[in-house]
Every structure is written in structure tokens, then in C-alpha cells.
């Protein structure tokens, strides 16, 4: 007999077990069993824990092996750590939704120094009392200023998308270097 050990790598099978073992005769086919893991998307069975060698269930059994489940977070959000308003007039927010809930990315109004009309406060680095406002806008922000910048509903396939926040030139700016922070909130529900 040949044996195939399937390690759920932190996930579990229907029987709440973390491992499944199948025994087959050479030439028979292994059965693919899919485990589940809270907050994660199953991304396949691999022959190694670095997930470089994906297992092919369409091939007949020839040797005993151990397979490892690869897990990916249900969602990924990419936001640049910083941008320079000297070169950029927009900030791109990217997202991938692999799960069954809706992913939304918006501004965290409690943590961001921003006006009701979505103008970001920029402070002069030499004298923080000298400030200016940089107007922000994104799709739908004119009618609903608190609207999420990016929303990805769950789909039958993995959904990917991006959205752009426009950043206008600061108003009433004086000479000097200015800095400001945007804090985003990510919801997955």
C-alpha cells in the first residue's frame, strides 16, 4: 500500500481532524479533500512547506507522500506607506477578496486630521501651527463623504480591484515642508 498524509496546516477537515491519511494501491488515484480554516482561503495542496511544488491529483499514486495545505488570508489590502505630493496627485488603494464577506477600505475619521468636507490637514514640519488643507476625493465621496474608497463584494471567484483617491494641491500653502497622515480602516464583514 501507498499512503498519502494530508496536513491541514492549522486548518481542519470535516471531522475536526488536522490530518487525513489515505491508503491506495499503486496506480489508483488519491482523493482530494479540502480542509477549512477560519479567516482563510484554501490555496491548494503542496509537497513541501515552502509551497513551491503543487500536488497533482490527476496523476495515479506511485509513491507515499505528505501534502501540506496552503492558506492565504481572506483578503489583502495594499496602500502605499507614503507619497510625495510634489510628484503624486493621487493615492491608489488595491484589494483582493478571496472570502465570503465584503471587504471595504475607507478613511478612519477618528485617527485622521480631516475636515467634514474631506480636506486633509497638512502641518509645516518647522512650525506645526502653520497648516494648510489638501482636498481629497474619490468615487462617491461628493455625495457621501464617509463612503468607503474601495469596496469588494464576495464573488464566485477571487475578486480584485483598486480605487484612486485624488489629492488636490493644498490650499493657502506657505513656503516650507508639510506633512500629514491618512489612517485607513479596513472592514471585512
Language-model regions, residue ranges each:
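Compositionally biased regions
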Residues: 4, 27-31, 59-65, 85, ...
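Assembly/interface hotspot detector across virion components, adhesins/toxins, and nucleic-acid enzymes
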Residues: 46, 111-112, 136-138
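Short glycine-aromatic motifs
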Residues: 11, 40, 75-77, 120, ...
Amino acid at each position: 500500500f501507498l499512503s498519502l498524509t494530508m496536513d491541514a496546516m492549522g486548518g481542519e477537515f470535516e471531522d475536526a481532524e488536522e490530518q487525513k491519511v489515505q491508503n491506495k494501491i499503486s496506480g489508483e488515484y488519491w482523493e482530494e479533500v479540502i480542509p477549512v480554516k477560519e479567516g482563510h482561503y484554501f490555496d491548494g495542496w503542496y509537497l513541501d512547506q515552502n509551497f513551491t511544488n503543487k500536488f497533482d491529483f490527476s496523476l495515479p499514486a506511485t509513491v507515499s507522500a505528505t501534502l501540506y495545505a496552503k492558506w492565504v488570508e481572506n483578503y489583502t489590502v495594499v496602500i502605499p506607506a507614503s507619497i510625495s505630493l510634489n510628484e503624486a496627485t493621487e493615492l491608489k488603494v488595491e484589494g483582493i477578496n478571496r472570502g465570503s464577506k465584503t471587504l471595504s477600505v475607507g478613511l478612519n475619521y477618528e485617527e485622521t486630521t480631516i475636515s467634514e468636507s474631506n480636506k486633509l490637514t497638512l502641518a509645516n514640519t518647522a512650525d506645526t501651527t502653520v497648516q494648510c488643507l489638501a482636498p481629497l476625493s474619490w468615487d462617491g465621496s461628493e455625495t457621501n463623504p464617509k463612503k468607503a474608497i474601495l469596496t469588494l463584494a464576495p464573488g464566485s471567484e477571487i475578486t480584485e480591484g483598486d480605487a484612486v483617491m485624488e489629492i488636490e494641491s493644498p490650499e493657502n500653502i506657505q513656503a516650507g515642508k508639510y506633512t500629514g497622515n491618512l489612517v485607513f480602516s479596513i472592514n471585512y464583514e
